[in-house]
Amino acid sequence: MRLSARGFVWSALLACTASALSEAAATASNSSQTLRTCVSQALVAGDVNTRIIDPSNDTYTDARLGEKIQFNEFPALIAYAKKAEEVASLVRCAQRSGFKAVPRSGGHHFEAWSALNGTLVIDLSHINHVNVSADTTTANVGAGIRQGALYLALDEHNVTFPGGICPTVALGGLVSSGGFSLQMRALGLAAEYVQSARVVLADGSLVTASSSSHEDLFWAIRGGGGGTYGIIVDFDLQLMQFPTSAMVAISWNASSDRYPVAQRFFDWAPVQIPAFTSQVNVYKSSINFLGQYLGGTENELRKLINESGLLNIGTPTVYISGNCDTDNSRLFGYTSYECVPANETNRQIMNVLPEPFSQYSDYPQYQYENEPEDPSIPIAEPWARFNRISKSFFMQKDNILPAADLKTVIDMMGQLDTDSEIWGEWHAWNISSATKADYAFPWREQAYAHLEFQVHGSLTNSTKQATYEKWFADLETYLRPKIGVASYSGEMDAHISTNPFESYYGDSVCRLVEVKKAYDPDNFFTNPDAITPTVPEGISC
């Protein structure tokens, strides 16, 4: 058969293309094998084959998922580190093999950006030690420790740390975002109680960041975003004892009560005494209120609530309890509505495993040294995974949301179906604590309240999923121009309509860029909304 000149050219092009694709596939395969070989040598603490997961493993799907069920991010390899030195070696492996390294402490990233496509995920969940000092004023704590396990470990020394409520959130992500809690109006954010941190840099070196060493890095890693400047492997935390508290939980089951309760909450809660921090949880047809009076008595709290005006709305169910120790305070409104003696407290929900999440579908679960912090009490039930869709907004002190706009938003929530499990978790801020340190979190002084919205997306019904996504797009379009640009970096949103760097980092952006340039000039540690070593588009420095 004779080929025309054109046919010959096309045949040659196809042959070249096939050859190029074959070479590219071979190169990728060789790179992956090079990475795996290096990682095998880096995991010096043993159990190498168990601590490396790639797409050939039947536990890969479980291992790549954190809390969010998603089918967008497929890392090349997941390595479960046990010591800081392993993390340093793993970073060097990624560099040599041509891969990015992505740290994962708790797996709660709202967009699943702690397991990015084609990367080496360095999982820190087994760097979860808690070493309390002899005088119990400080502790060295692994960045992968989950909050529930941390609190149980500190209970043994009759001390604690002002972190959040969710027991499966890890310390690394909490501090990197700022870290708010039901004690924050009196005590400030979790990041303020970090005395130092050890950080693996992009070149694989391990440095200590504190107020006297690598001060710029120390500033950035507290509230300047996670997985950006280096990989934090552990923290030195300042510990404390909480005074006994009084707790309140109030619920309303009439849909018509949602707006008046929420409006009263925003008018009243953020301007109460700093010892009182509270939130409302707004649903499709109900609303509830939760508050902690740190150091207050039951009578003091009853007086506060009686004067709030909340009890004049609808027919509320009210629970108020006093003399609540630290664990009772954290459990109140979630697993109990009564503060009981310490030896009667059911702390099961806090006794989370290093791998705490529920099984997804019939995919086998990854298990490695999955032991609870306290083997003497029942293990926490697996934390449910779901397809989260969410948004975050800060209400600023100089831009309080008008009542009519709040009502519109609540009416929008009522339009979603029951399957969405729509939830607005709205916290009173207006932090007046004098403990503020110099750190990167940008909204501490101006935040009046924080509003998070979330639904359970549908994995099986594309029409329903599209409806939910449009609802969030409509919420962004309606609410963002009215409430402002500020959002919480711990609740990132790929579909935010504003410049994400301005929204998450505010006036800290330019200083954070300088830190990034100093410690990671080649942008080795990155995710779609991470600070870059050059000034981001739309930002003026």
From Swiss-Prot:
Effect of loss of the gene: Leads to the accumulation of pyranonigrin G.
Pathway field: Secondary metabolite biosynthesis
Residue ranges of domain FAD-binding PCMH-type in the record: 71-242
Sugar-bearing residue positions: N30, N57, N117, N131, N158, N253, N306, N343, N430, N461
Residues spanning the signal sequence: 1-20
EC numbers for this chain: 1.1.1.-
Keywords, sorted A to Z: FAD, Flavoprotein, Glycoprotein, Oxidoreductase, Signal
Inducing stimuli: Expression is positively regulated by the cluster-specific transcription factor pynR.
Cofactor: FAD
GO MF term set: FAD binding; oxidoreductase activity
Biological process terms in GO annotation: secondary metabolic process
SUPFAM superfamilies according to UniProt: FAD-binding/transporter-associated domain-like
Annotated InterPro entries: BBE (IPR012951), FAD-bd_PCMH (IPR016166), FAD-bd_PCMH-like_sf (IPR036318), FAD-bd_PCMH_sub2 (IPR016169), FAD-linked_Oxidoreductase (IPR050416), Oxid_FAD_bind_N (IPR006094)
EC class (word): oxidoreductase
UniProt similarity note: Belongs to the oxygen-dependent FAD-linked oxidoreductase family.
Function, as annotated: FAD-linked oxidoreductase; part of the gene cluster that mediates the biosynthesis of pyranonigrins, a family of antioxidative compounds. The first step of pyranonigrins biosynthesis is performed by the hybrid PKS-NRPS synthetase that condenses 6 malonyl-CoA units to an acetyl starter unit, to form a 1,3,5-trioxotetradecane-6,8-dienyl-ACP. The enoyl reductase (ER) domain of pynA is likely to be functional during the first two rounds of polyketide chain extension, to generate the saturated C-C bonds of the alkyl side chain.
Protein name per its UniProtKB record: FAD-linked oxidoreductase pynB
Organism, as annotated: Aspergillus niger (strain ATCC MYA-4892 / CBS 513.88 / FGSC A1513)
Gene giving rise to this polypeptide: pynB
